Amino acid sequence: MTKIIVVTSGKGGVGKTTTSASFSAGLALRGHKTAVIDFDVGLRNLDLIMGCERRVVYDLINVIHGEANLNQALIKDKHCDNLYVLAASQTRDKDALHQLGVGKVFKELENMGFEYIICDSPAGIETGALMAMHFADEALVVTNPEVSSVRDSDRILGMLGSKTRRAIEGAEPVKEHLLITRYNPGRVEDGHMLSLQDIQDILRIKIIGVIPESDIVLQASNQGSPVIHMEGTDVSEAYKDVVARFLGEEKPLRFIEAEKPSFFKRLFGGR
């Protein structure tokens, strides 16, 4: 059975698209046929991070409005055989999205044998975000360890509990997972960032992963490659852990403790 997962947040710039790219790639690397869809109509960034921007001919809106079929619009990922990208439109208005059309796209992807559909949602509560979350079975709620980001995520949790198809039909609720990005244990210790416990006390949903703050994320984006492919880096390992936990594996949280200075660093006055 196909599962639809929305990657969402209340605030922009927290790493939703980075997460959508690496999470979908991680599922595909584990052998699952996966589609990742950009719902940010008018802006479109997912194709850049996936490195397929020059291969976009048709997009989600073209498919919804019958201007192209799904096979024409899906772009096969260059890294993973099981991964396909459906880009957003840069030229249409968000009102071009409608529930019936989105539902038909999901049904067709299910008929094509996709196990997972990852919806890269725009931030906030506009049309694209509502469409991305409406059909969701599960949600990755992405937040930074900052008060404003966490507060906005709380608002999104309220919408997942009231605006989705599952909520409207009185079905089992959307399964919510909390993903914390740009986490810097040193800044947490200094009191400049919220701790994991602070965030959980506010949002009260289970943490599926913690992604450390790193310049590697920008480097991967500039190269047009999901950061999960940056082998040997903390960020790549953290996203692999997220995928493993999502698939039911037990993995302890990593990269959540500040590095202690070595004996020699302390001896010679390093901090």
Where are these regions (language model features)?
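Walker A/P-loop NTP-binding active-site region of P-loop NTPases
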Residues: 4-69, 116
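Flexible glycine-/small-residue-rich
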Residues: 9, 38, 87-90, 121, ...
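Residue-level signature of catalytic and energy-coupling elements of molecular machines
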Residues: 12, 63, 86, 120, ...
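Alpha-helical segments flanking ligand/cofactor-binding loops in enzyme cores
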Residues: 25, 107, 130-131
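P-loop/Walker-type NTP enzyme "switch/lid" segment
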Residues: 39-111, 221-222
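Amphipathic alpha-helical transducer elements in NTP-driven molecular machines
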Residues: 57, 71, 99, 103, ...
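Conserved catalytic-core segment of NTP-binding enzymes
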Residues: 111-112, 116, 122-208
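C-terminal lobe/tail of nucleotide-utilizing enzymes
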Residues: 167-271
